[in-house]
Regions:
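Histidine-rich, glycine-flanked metal-binding segment
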Residues: 1-51
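Divalent metal-coordination and catalytic microenvironments
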Residues: 8, 22, 27, 47, ...
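Divalent metal-dependent hydrolysis catalytic cores, especially in the metallo-beta-lactamase
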Residues: 60, 76-105, 119-132, 159-171, ...
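Active-site mouth loops of central-metabolism enzymes
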Residues: 61-73, 138-145, 188-192
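Charged helix-capping and loop-helix junction motifs
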Residues: 71-74, 105-108, 148-149, 225-230
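Conserved phosphate-binding/catalytic loop of the ribokinase/pfkB sugar-kinase fold
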Residues: 132-157
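Active-site core of metal-dependent hydrolases
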Residues: 157-230
Length: 230
């Protein structure tokens, strides 16, 4: 099935098109054109601007719903409400918590994927629990500890492979080995909530870490004399 959307303006990756029509073919966006075939079905959004949906890769809750509720209702509520903000995909993000609680969140998320009526769940993000206390922010230090591969495997099994991002502090013991194993499983490793030195941070990067969390906020600040995580 093919139909067309008319709009005031269309935003593409490297250009903007004024007016015209965007084809939708079997549920997927197609080509833009100035005109449409005679008799074509057209949805009129001429007072609106059309742009790609946003992807929120770090979100703990929205519209009164919280990932730590550990409920399908909350995840689906976030999914529907996020459309109002232009978000079409997201990573529900869990905070530092006990191992079993995080495992339960993995199971709930895995069971919810595919039931969304709004923004799609693209995977799960664990912000913790492998942080350190100095720059803990809102994270609960009681449940912080050194990274353990066996925990990751248990979480990943419960999540049916949906745990795709995890943030940790690079000064934790055993970080390099953990990062190497996690990245083999397709998990993106982020660095944050950390009091690490530059050398500790770079060792984590060399092991495979590739993303930062709360840079210039949840980490020790740098000076003209010493580079740090930031």
């Amino acid at each position: 099935m093919t139909y067309y959307i008319s709009a005031k303006r269309f935003y593409f990756e490297n250009k903007i098109k004024e007016g015209g029509y965007l084809a939708v073919v079997d549920g997927r966006f197609g080509d833009w054109s100035e005109n449409v075939p005679e008799g074509a079905e057209v949805l009129d959004y001429s007072n609106y601007q059309i742009a790609p949906g946003l992807v929120d890769t770090h979100i703990h809750g929205f519209a009164g719903y919280d990932v730590m509720d550990n409920s399908e209702e909350s995840l689906l509520g976030m999914s529907q409400a996020l459309l109002s903000a232009g978000v079409t995909s997201f990573l529900p993000t869990a905070l530092t918590a006990p191992f079993e609680e995080l495992k339960a969140i993995c199971q709930t998320t895995a069971n919810t994927v595919g039931k969304e009526t709004g923004a799609k769940i693209q995977g799960l993000f664990f912000e913790g629990p492998y942080f350190t206390e100095t720059y803990k922010g809102a994270q609960n230090p009681i449940y912080m500890g050194n990274p353990r591969v066996e925990q990751l495997k248990a979480w990943q099994e419960a999540a049916q492979g949906k745990l795709i991002k995890l943030a940790l502090a690079p000064e934790r013991e055993g970080v390099a080995e953990f990062i190497q194993e996690a990245t083999k499983q397709g998990v993106t490793i982020a660095l944050g909530h950390s009091n690490a030195t530059y050398e500790e941070a770079m060792a984590a990067v060399e092991a495979g870490a590739s993303v930062w969390v709360h840079v210039y906020n949840g980490v020790r600040g740098f000076t003209h004399q010493k580079l740090l995580v930031s």
